[in-house]
Structures are given as C-alpha cells and as structure tokens.
C-alpha cells in the first residue's frame, strides 16, 4: 500500500500496517501471535516492541528505545527477547513478558545484537563494532577527506557555495534527540548548532532547518542568534530531507497529517498551514533551483516524478531508474542520479527532458573493510564538491548458554 508497510501472516492476511517501518517479525511458538519491532520513522531504528494476534489486535510491550535491532521468542513463548538501547549505540539484551514486564538479561562492552534463540534456550548473538562516517572532497583536492565527527555521523546537505556541510551526529555522543552540526569541507572542526535532525541550509547560508524528535520544526542559526520554532500547522511527524525554496521564505518537506500517509508539503517559515503538493505516499521532496518543481519519489513504485509547485499534473523523469537517488544540478534541466551500493557508487548526470544519461563520477572508498553500504550521496549544485556517508560493521558471532 502506498506510503505504508504491512505485516501479513499468513501471506495475504494483513495483521498490521504503519506509515513507519516494520522489522524482525517472529511468529510465536504456538503460531497465534507475531512479535516485531515497530519503527515510526523510515530509516531510523528507534521504536517499540509490539505483538499482534491473528485477529489484528496489536499491543505495545515495551517503548522508548532509541535503537532496537534483533528479536526472538523465548522457547516457551511467554517472553519476547530483543536487543535495544535507550541512548547511543550499545544495545543490551532484554526480555519482556506479554503483560509488559521488562527485565535486562545480558550486556557486554560495546553492545550486542540478538540473532536467534534455540529451542533449548541458547542465544545466538553478535558483538558489533559499528560506525557511520562521512567522506568528501572539494575542488582541487587530490584525495577524499574523512569528515566524520564522532561514531555515527550522517551527511545531510551542502551550503550554497559547496564549502560547508550540515550533518547529524546520532551515536553515543549525539544525545537523545541527536545533534545538528556544520563543518567546513576544507578541514575546520565541526561546529554544533543544537539538538535535532538536520535539514538543508537556507539560500543565504544563515540558517539550517531541523526537526526535534520528528515532531517540531526549528530553524537553527549558523552564526550568532537564537533558534526559531515553526508552527507545525497540523503535521504530526516530519520526514527528511527538509529543504528551502529559492526565495528563502518557504520550506519543502515530507510530513504526515493525523491518520494520513506521508506526502510533500510547502510551508512559509513564518507559520501558516502547510500546503500539500503531492499525493499521499510520495516523499523525498526536492525543490528545483528555479523553484517551479518538486522532484519526489513514489514509495510504492520507487519511481521519481516531477510535481509543479503551482499545481497541475505531475510528469515522469525520463531516464531515471526506479529506486535511484536523485538531486538537482544548478541547471533545472539536469539532475544527478545514483544508486546506493556496498563499496562503490556511480553518479550520472541526467537530462530530464531527453532522458540522456552521462557518467559524471564514480565514488569508491579506499578502505572497504566491513563496509555495509554507501549512502546519502550529496553533490553541490555545480558538482565540484561532494560528500557521502558510509556504514562499517565488524561483528563477532557468539553462542551463549545459561541465560534465564
């Protein structure tokens, strides 16, 4: 279903659906319930532990987890075991019974992730060394520079001149709401701006849009000044990216109204009601450099389309492949298109009128040990500066006996 994920058991019988995402579904030993991790925001693993019966009655067993990965039923089916943390990255093993009584079962330095539980009670788990970092380059540079800050840095956007990057720090030191920071690509230390998840730079570079816990939209000054709150206008949850129109007075973002799937909106920073510019289920909203179009992705088809900001029928983007990431160049007739990869990514310059594609750049890190993928590939409008994120995971597998 557009804009929603569904949990089915058996196949075709819908038990639960959400505008967020579902992970680690496990059927109970009796086959009468499904336990799963329920994440309210796409690509963020914070969330709750839930169970749903075959009639579709869902219950939350444990909530408030900043990161949750891995879940399994106990052999008797009286508890759900999972790995999670309330802050940072170092997950522990917890057990919760069907009445919501929670207990900690196991922890280890560096954190662990539950993989499975055997019928005799033995646990299969991994001890993980995880890191999310940022690499980038500027005009004239002979090699890429590591622009990471702490242990979980995610690039979000580049300044209009391509010299600065705004990013999130989401790891152990990022805090419960994460931290928004900026950094000069040429080597200056990071400068924290405040709590939240970052959006883009304003056209004059003086502000960065951000959200706090996905529910409050704020503007953070990049220099002296105080932050500003923007009225939600009925938006229950914000998605990313959050970008500016060229006039510097309006923001473009994906958001969810009560009971609705995510869609793209435009809103004046002085407040007022957000205006929907795409149907539900269409997100990843990128304004064109002339402010006339919103490029966005249909979650059902994974296909990018162009939506006129002033209304009218959307149009296809010839040459853009389903699932490809895209961003605008400084010329509204062209886009950069790329597909995330594990160890390398090819970036194409795409003529959105003719569909002609030309290889523009290939990104390949020098150290591919433990790489899980490259993501968040961001280019300046002129294509001369770029940054990208990488995730590295090194794991040791353990069999644990004797836990109760």
Residue ranges: model-predicted function:
Residues 1, 15-39, 44, 58-83, ...:
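Conserved beta-propeller blade repeats
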Residues 3-8, 44-50, 88-94, 131-136, ...:
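Structural motif
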Residues 9-12, 53-57, 97-101, 138-142, ...:
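Short loop/turn segments that connect beta-strands within beta-propeller blades
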Residues 39-42, 85-87, 128, 139, ...:
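Short polar/acidic secondary-structure junctions
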Residues 123-125, 132-145, 165:
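An edge-strand/N-cap motif at the start of beta-rich repeat modules
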């Amino acid at each position: 279903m557009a804009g929603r994920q569904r949990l089915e058991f058996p196949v075709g019988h819908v038990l639960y659906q959400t505008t967020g995402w579902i992970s680690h579904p496990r059927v109970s030993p009796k086959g009468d319930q499904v336990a799963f991790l329920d994440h309210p925001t796409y690509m963020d693993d914070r969330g709750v532990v839930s169970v749903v019966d075959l009639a579709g009655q869902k219950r939350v067993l444990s909530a408030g987890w900043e990161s949750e990965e891995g879940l399994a039923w106990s052999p008797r089916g009286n508890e759900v075991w999972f790995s999670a943390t309330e802050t940072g990255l170092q997950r522990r093993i917890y057990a919760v019974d069907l009445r919501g009584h929670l207990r900690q079962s196991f922890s280890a330095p560096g954190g662990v992730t539950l993989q499975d539980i055997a019928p005799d009670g033995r646990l299969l788990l991994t001890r993980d060394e995880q890191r999310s970092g940022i690499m980038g380059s500027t005009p004239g540079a002979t090699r890429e520079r590591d622009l990471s800050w702490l242990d979980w840095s995610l690039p979000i956007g580049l300044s209009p001149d391509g010299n600065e990057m705004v990013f999130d720090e989401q790891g152990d030191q990022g805090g419960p709401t994460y931290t928004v920071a900026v950094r000069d690509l040429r080597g200056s230390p990071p400068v924290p701006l405040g709590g939240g998840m970052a959006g883009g730079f304003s056209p004059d570079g003086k502000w960065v849009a951000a959200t706090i816990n996905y529910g409050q939209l704020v503007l953070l000054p990049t220099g002296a000044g105080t932050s500003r709150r923007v009225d939600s206008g009925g938006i229950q949850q914000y998605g990313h990216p959050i970008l500016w129109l060229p006039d510097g007075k309006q923001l473009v973002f994906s958001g969810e109204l009560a009971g609705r799937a995510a869609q793209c909106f435009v809103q004046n920073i002085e407040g007022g009601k957000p205006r929907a510019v795409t149907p539900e289920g269409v997100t990843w909203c990128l304004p064109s450099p002339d402010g006339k179009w919103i490029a966005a992705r249909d979650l059902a088809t994974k296909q990018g389309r162009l939506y006129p900001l002033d209304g009218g029928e959307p149009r296809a983007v010839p040459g853009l492949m389903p699932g490809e990431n895209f961003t605008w160049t400084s010329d509204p007739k062209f886009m950069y298109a790329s597909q995330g990869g594990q160890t390398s990514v090819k970036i194409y310059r795409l003529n959105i009128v003719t569909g002609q594609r030309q290889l523009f750049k290939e990104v390949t890190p020098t150290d591919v040990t433990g790489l899980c993928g490259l993501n968040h590939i961001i280019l300046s409008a002129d294509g001369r500066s770029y940054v990208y994120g990488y995730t590295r995971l090194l794991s040791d597998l353990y069999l644990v006996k004797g836990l109760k």
